[in-house]
Amino acid sequence: MVWKVRRVVTGHDQDGKSVFIMDGYAPNVLEMASMPGLALTDLWETKGAPASNDGNADAAARPVHLEPPKNGTILRIVEFPPDSQWRQSADARKAFDSIGAGHAPDKHSADPMMHKTSTVDYIIVLKGEIW
C-alpha cells in the first residue's frame, strides 16, 4: 500500500510575506504497473540552479519522470516492496520506459533496477532494508 505523504509548501502573499500555500497529501504519486508495489511520490522539483522562489505554482504538478531538468532537482519518495513480492514478475524495461528513462538501465549490472544517469541521488532508508 502506497504511503500517503503530507506535504506542506510555503510561498508568498501579495505583500511578500511567507505564508502556507499548500498543506495536504502529495498528489503526484505513480504506482509502477510493471513493478508491483513500487511507487514514486514526487514532492517538489526545481528547474535549475539557483532555484527560483517566485510564484506559488505547484512545482511537482507534472508527470513523474526519472531525471530532473538539467541543473535541477527532484525531491521524491520511492517505496520498494520486498524483493519476494516483485523480483520475479518485474519488468524493469517497461518501468524505466514509463518514466521517460529507457536509456538509463545499467546493462552491466545483474540488478534490473540499477541505472546510470547524470544525477546525484541521496537515499535515506526510512523503513526496512535495501539489498
How should each PLM-predicted stretch be described?
Residues 1-105:
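A short, N-terminal "cap"/entry segment at the start of jelly-roll beta-barrel domains
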Residues 66-67, 112-114:
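Short Gly/Pro-enriched turn/cap motifs at secondary-structure boundaries
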Residues 100-111, 118:
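A contiguous catalytic/ligand-binding core that recognizes phosphate-bearing ligands
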Residues 79-82, 115-131:
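Short, conserved beta-strand element in jelly-roll/cupin
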